[in-house]
From Swiss-Prot:
Recorded superkingdom: Eukaryota
Source species of the chain: Rattus norvegicus
Recorded name of the encoding gene: Coq8a
Sequence motif KxGQ motif, location on chain: 277-280
Subunit text: Homodimer; homodimerizes via its transmembrane region. Interacts with the multi-subunit COQ enzyme complex, composed of at least COQ3, COQ4, COQ5, COQ6, COQ7 and COQ9.
Protein name: Atypical kinase COQ8A, mitochondrial
Family: Belongs to the protein kinase superfamily. ADCK protein kinase family.
Length: 649
């Protein structure tokens, strides 16, 4: 009889354990963790005590069988143990209530010393603001979401001991209001930190360093495109016109099959450097300019390139920072969380616990800019993928010079510091701080920021999207007409929005360039005339700026004037300008073939990067379907410029 009761005790206690685990799991799935889980554990411990009381007398009658039952229960407990066991000598003291209130990041800090969770989420400058009294350790914040199981299970073991041996009054104080607060905190979307992650399609592939190695990749691409075009012709599946009846500029070649598009992307992601940068420039164009399918393929190029192997990456760091660069870090994540055309970005943590982002340049890209551009243009021209005149020789020369400057990370660091100073008091924009001790010509280290790129901001409210886009356009005008220095790369990923602090972080100042006042004095008058829809004034200033010679055919002159006036429509509108429904890109798309065919002289060199930034900013507004009046922002910029100019005279 005693043996049977011993077995019953073992089974009952085991069922209580399993019930506890099931209840906790269900509560977590419902998003009702925290206090409710503590209450569930209290009920479980009470149930176990009641079981012991019921069978207590029988247990007392037979000590041997009681010992047998206890031993078997401990065996069962070991098999279904859902708590994280503590290392010998490392168990925290739960004798006081205060020990339970310590931040979990400190309790688990030693266990994670080799590295944080995939914490491309930082406590960061945004996260620290307004969070006094909370743990600043990124592990404390990240573990709250990514490691909820580990944390709760760690506490399960310790709190269970507390309930068996200590007063249960704190749990008894749980109220309906506490439960509701826990539920709301769980459901609040802005409480979730945002992290940047490498594209799932990104692969580890060695960067070809030598010119011969890079040329071989372009040669293989050319051969592959040729066979792909033959297959496309054989299938008679040339691109059809889109639903609006117009064809994209790049939608005119049998070389532009789906298979060939994948070949292009694969090659660009492997060689990286200047060739990939050109592909990224095409990726941020509107669908009216390039084939929509190719735009989607290039989207993968824009989001993430492939990343270099550990050995190649380590060699770059050793060459630039010396063999002991790791001594300056507490932790370094060997797999990057972002990869782009010129470099890849790794998470690291300084000795003091501050998280940083280390951008490491791919080896050989700076030395191969000229050959890469020549090779890619040869392949694209051979396949007739680009319309004649789209990338004339003078534009290629400008791109070469810009890419050479972008490869100088020390120059980029200097401009990042300049913009950080210019925008230090701005309520909406933020520039991450440079970590000088981990910077070199090929390594750039900044504080880690939080948020997500603007291509993921389409789900935000209309009010927030309007504010983001409004500030971006105002910044463009200030960069050109107030700062006289502009970050000219409008890539989505260079703008990170943090919903918790309602700020946008500005990244990547490699494409920054300065503008002389002699240029801006004329250019602001062109924009003034466009905002006034003054056709004659636009023509006069365009000739003065050498956009035109004055001897162009009428078709070219009209196309140029129309394009300028179309861009000025937004600044001419006192009413909210709906970027989501405007037809600016389509109108300009229709003018491109005329301007490519009849242009007599190239436009001023400054306008390539300037129009890339302005056009990209308008495209951001279009993609986010922003709607707000723009006339006042330009009028303010114009008034400030004139006032500043008169003050200098």
């Amino acid at each position: 009889m005693a043996a049977m009761l011993g077995d019953a005790i073992m089974v009952a206690k085991g069922l209580a354990k399993l019930t506890q685990a099931a209840v906790e799991t269900h509560l977590q799935n419902l998003g009702l963790g925290g206090e409710l889980i503590l209450a569930a554990r209290a009920l479980q411990s009470t149930a176990v005590e009641q079981i012991s009381m019921v069978f207590g007398k029988v247990q007392g009658q037979d000590k041997h069988e009681d010992s047998y039952a206890t031993e078997n229960f401990e065996d069962l407990e070991a098999e279904v143990q859902f708590s994280t066991p503590q290392a010998a000598g490392s168990s925290p003291d739960f004798s006081t209530a205060s020990s339970l209130d310590q931040p979990l990041s400190s309790s688990l800090g030693h266990a994670h010393r080799e590295g944080p969770a995939p914490a491309y989420v930082s406590s960061g400058p945004f996260r620290e603001a307004g969070l006094s009294g909370q743990a600043t350790s990124p592990l404390g914040r990240v573990n709250g979401r990514l490691f909820v199981d580990c944390r709760d299970l760690f506490l399960a073991n310790s709190i269970q001991r507390r309930f068996f041996h200590q007063d249960q009054a704190p749990v008894g104080g749980l109220t309906a209001e506490d439960i509701e607060k826990a539920r709301q905190a769980k459901a609040r979307p802005e409480s979730k930190p945002h992290k940047q992650m490498l594209s799932e399609r990104a692969r580890e592939r060695k960067v070809p360093v030598t010119r011969i190695g890079r040329l071989a990749n372009f040669g293989g691409l050319a051969v592959g495109l040729g066979f792909g075009a033959l297959a496309e012709v054989a299938k008679k599946s040339l691109r059809s016109e889109n639903s609006t009846g117009k064809k994209a500029v790049l939608d005119s070649s049998p070389f532009l099959s789906e298979a060939n598009a994948e070949r292009i992307v694969s090659t660009l992601c492997k060689v990286r450097g200047a060739a990939l940068k050109l592909g990224q420039m095409l990726s941020i164009q509107d669908d009216a300019f390039i084939n929509p399918h190719l735009a989607k393929i290039f989207e993968r190029v824009r989001q993430s390139a492939d990343f270099m192997p550990l050995k190649q990456m380590t060699k770059t760091l050793n060459n630039d920072l010396g063999p002991h660069w790791r001594d300056k870090l507490e932790y370094f994540e060997e797999r990057p969380f972002a990869a782009a055309s010129i470099g890849q970005v790794h998470l690291a943590r300084l000795k003091g616990g501050r998280e940083v982002a280390m951008k490491i340049q791919y080896p050989g890209v700076a030395q191969s800019i000229n050959s890469d551009v020549n090779n890619l243009m040869a392949v694209l021209n051979m396949s007739n993928m680009l319309p004649e005149g789209l990338f004339p020789e003078h534009l290629i020369d400008v791109l070469r010079r810009e890419l050479t400057l972008e490869c100088d990370y020390q120059r980029e660091a200097a401009y990042a510091k300049k913009f950080r100073e210019l925008l230090k008091d701005h309520p909406f924009f933020y520039v991450p701080e440079i970590v000088d001790e981990l910077c070199s010509p090929h390594v750039l280290t900044t504080e880690l920021i939080t948020g997500f790129p603007l291509d993921q901001a389409e789900g935000l409210s209309q009010e927030v999207r309007n504010e983001i886009c409004y500030n971006i356009l105002v910044l463009c005008l200030r960069e050109l007409f107030e700062f006289h220095v502009m970050q000219t790369d409008p890539n989505w990923s260079n703008f990170f929005y943090d919903p918790q602090q309602h700020k946008v972080a500005l990244l990547d100042f490699g494409a920054t360039r300065e503008y002389d006042r002699s240029f801006t004095d004329l250019y602001i008058q062109v924009i003034r005339a466009a905002a006034d829809q003054d056709r004659e004034a636009v023509l006069k200033k365009s000739i003065e700026m050498k956009f035109l010679t004055g001897y162009e055919v009428k078709a070219m002159e009209d196309a140029h004037l129309d394009a300028i006036l179309i861009l000025g429509e937004a600044f001419a509108s006192e009413e909210p300008f709906d970027f989501g429904t405007q037809s600016t890109t389509e109108k300009i798309h229709n003018l491109i073939p005329i301007m490519l065919k009849h242009r007599l002289i190239p436009p001023p060199e400054e306008t390539y990067s300037l129009h890339r930034k302005m056009g990209g900013s308008f495209l951001i507004c279009s993609k986010l379907k922003a709607c707000f009046p723009c006339k006042a922002m330009f009028e303010e910029a114009y008034s400030n410029y004139c006032r500043m100019k008169s003050g200098l005279q």
